């Protein structure tokens, strides 16, 4: 197994904001390999750091860089290895084995990268690492480089994992009543609302370990950054600030959608692991305002054929035009009968530019798995939700969407754990035609404004980004 690092590129320079020239202080950004929802927010943080004068380098595995176009200016890119250079995580069906190999080989190749950059006269000031890769902090600091943890999920979920790590919450964590009583949660979480890794620890032990392990050595991190903002979850943010010294730097989305004129050309993430389908934009142009249901369940969540049939029939029965994103590796699960039925009222695509679609005037509702990145994308565009959570942080986020933020409803599964077409239809009609439809839209627009205020010049999150950049540009 080859373990030497391959550095890629190193000559691009920023074309936005203040700019980051060749002599600028360098910051390395290390997201979880192959996870679009972890990579996208870190890229946007990098763009903002470049605006403030730092020079960002995206660090990805060799496999990811071999299959994905480089993000372009203002980023340099560099490679490490996860031990599976030919195919990434897909070559290792055992998550525990993959995470172990990633730590072993990733640590070695990251160390080599940091040392080679120092020898070449390009020393790295700080490594911003995905908190799921806690081992990266040790590597950076042992190499004389500062380390900043980046949490890509909301503080509400961080509270649960942080308290599990600290031993103040026991497994299985089946409800959040104790956390609510202590004032560190703003919403009461029941069994169906808790992160399933914590509520049913035997279901995904490897993912539970890396989720709780985000807090390993966090006291020693030089900085702790979170992709959230104060107004959206104030009690949870306060917990992260007081307990873990965290700073909110979100929502880390392309600035075009945040009304931030400082980075006017920043309209996309620029590092897509999947190819978008532009046909859908032409189709949307033919639809009426706020009439279309966008249906997307992310890059990781999978559903069996029966559940997809129920979802598809529920969409059709709602009588609303819909844009349904079914990944190419999932399309074979759809029956020809369902495809024909869907084609009469909606459009099925393998992928779409989700942020651009959510900003389109025709979108009136978002049926989503409630991944945090997707949730923030809908939030900054004022789009109400139907939440159909699958795993990880999604059930907790769905609870907040419905109970704390009043932006939509959560679809309930039956006693057998199955989503039925009648429930899908009911939820869509509730959000788009029900008595509370205006309330959902009003709340969505309110949160949209608060999210934009946090990231615009002088906003709470914007200040934290600027302070972080100043700290490392002045060392």
UniProtKB/Swiss-Prot annotation:
Pfam families, per database record: UDPGT (PF00201)
InterPro entries: UDP_glucos_trans
Keywords from the UniProt entry: Detoxification, Glycosyltransferase, Nucleotide-binding, Transferase
Xref: Gene3D superfamilies: Glycogen Phosphorylase B
GO cellular component, one term: cytoplasm
Top-rank EC class of the record's enzyme: transferase
Disordered as annotated region, ranges: 1-20
Residues bound to UDP-alpha-D-glucose: 38, 152, 299, 352, 369-377, 393-394
GO molecular function: nucleotide binding; quercetin 3-O-glucosyltransferase activity; quercetin 7-O-glucosyltransferase activity; UDP-glycosyltransferase activity
EC number(s) stated in the UniProt entry for this protein: 2.4.1.-
Gene Ontology BP terms: detoxification
Composition skew (Low complexity), residue ranges: 1-17
Family note: Belongs to the UDP-glycosyltransferase family.
Protein name: UDP-glucosyltransferase UGT13248
């Amino acid at each position: 197994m080859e373990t030497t690092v391959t550095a890629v590129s190193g000559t691009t320079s920023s074309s936005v904001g203040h700019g980051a020239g060749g002599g600028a202080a360098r910051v390395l950004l290390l997201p979880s390999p192959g996870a679009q929802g972890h990579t996208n927010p870190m890229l946007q943080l990098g763009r903002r750091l470049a605006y403030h004068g730092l020079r960002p380098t995206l660090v990805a595995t060799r496999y990811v860089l071999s299959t994905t176009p480089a993000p372009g200016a203002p980023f340099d890119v560099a490679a490490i290895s996860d031990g599976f250079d030919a195919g990434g995580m897909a070559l290792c069906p055992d998550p525990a084995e993959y995470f172990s190999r990633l730590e072993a080989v990733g640590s070695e190749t990251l160390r080599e990268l940091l040392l080679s950059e120092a020898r070449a006269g390009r020393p790295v000031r700080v490594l911003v690492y995905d908190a799921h890769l806690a081992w990266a902090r040790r590597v950076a600091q042992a190499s004389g480089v500062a380390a900043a943890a980046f949490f890509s999920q909301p503080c509400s979920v961080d509270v649960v994992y942080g308290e599990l790590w600290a031993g103040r919450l026991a497994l299985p964590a089946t409800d959040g009543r104790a956390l609510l009583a202590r004032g560190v949660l703003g919403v009461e979480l029941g069994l169906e609302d808790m992160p399933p890794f914590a509520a049913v620890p035997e279901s995904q032990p490897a993912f539970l370990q890396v989720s709780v392990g985000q807090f390993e050595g966090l006291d020693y991190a030089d900085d702790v950054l979170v992709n959230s903002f104060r107004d959206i979850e104030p009690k949870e943010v306060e917990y992260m600030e007081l307990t873990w010294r965290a700073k909110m730097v979100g929502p880390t989305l392309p600035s075009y959608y945040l009304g931030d004129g400082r980075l006017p050309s920043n309209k996309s993430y620029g590092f897509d692991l999947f190819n978008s389908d532009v046909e859908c934009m032409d189709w949307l142009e033919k639809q009426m305002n706020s009439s279309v249901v966008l249906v997307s369940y992310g890059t990781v969540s999978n559903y069996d054929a029966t559940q997809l049939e129920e979802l598809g029939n529920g969409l059709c029965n709602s009588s609303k035009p819909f844009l349904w994103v079914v990944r190419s590796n999932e399309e074979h699960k759809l029956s020809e009968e369902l495809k024909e039925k869907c084609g009469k009222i909606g459009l099925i695509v393998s992928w779409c530019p989700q942020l651009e679609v959510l900003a389109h005037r025709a979108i009136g509702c978002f049926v989503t798995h409630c991944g945090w990145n997707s949730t923030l994308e809908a939030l900054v565009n004022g789009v109400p939700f139907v939440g159909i959570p699958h795993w990880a942080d999604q059930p907790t986020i769905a609870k907040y969407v419905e109970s704390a933020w009043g932006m939509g409803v959560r679809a309930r599964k039956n006693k057998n754990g199955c989503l039925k077409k009648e429930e899908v239809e009911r939820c869509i009609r509730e959000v788009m035609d029900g008595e509370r439809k205006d309330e959902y839209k009003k709340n969505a627009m309110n949160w949209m404004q608060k999210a934009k205020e946090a990231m615009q010049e002088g906003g709470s999150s914007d200040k934290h980004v600027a302070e972080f950049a100043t700290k490392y540009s002045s060392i």
